[in-house]
């Protein structure tokens, strides 16, 4: 299959699945992990691969990605044994504001509430285990159905708490744009 240039593709798995040209930046995963920082701010000019880098990190660490081994098989991170063993072992929340283009405050709030509702719905399986009180399950479904948009302020923190209870591991949160 002829390799193509992946213009505009910001999803690591799509680039790998399409066998598109890719400059291996997986060494960033090791550098970032070994830094031990609680918070990392990635600043680069537009079109410098920030979103693709976040996608790569998310897909490397995420418990929910099924083909991690295959995606990263021919990359530099495969050679870093102490980091390689961490692949697919963390809950990951990923949020992007790139589609939030509203100019009115109330519309912006509703749009963000919708994005967070999508994230909550992806993790609906959390409500099936006995890790939440009935009140917490109500809270979860209120966020998932956008019934309480004013609660979005603490919703990511609450979701990360639920994920921590479920997996017993700290949660990686990626926020883009």
What residue ranges belong to the model's regions?
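Walker A/P-loop-proximal flanking segment of P-loop NTPase domains
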Residues: 1-79
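P-loop NTPase motor core
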Residues: 8, 13, 62-126
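Phosphate/oxyanion-binding active-site loops and adjacent basic polyanion-contact surfaces
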Residues: 20-21, 104, 108, 112, ...
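Loop/turn-to-beta-strand initiation segments
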Residues: 38, 91, 168-172
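A structural signal for short, well-ordered beta-strand segments and their strand-loop junctions
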Residues: 41-43, 53, 94, 172-175
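RecA-like P-loop NTPase motor core of helicase/translocase proteins
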Residues: 56, 67, 113, 117, ...
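Glycine-rich, often proline-containing surface loops adjacent to acidic residues and nearby aromatics
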Residues: 89-96, 137, 174-177
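Mid-core helix/loop region of P-loop NTP-binding domains shared across ATPases and GTPases
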Residues: 122-174
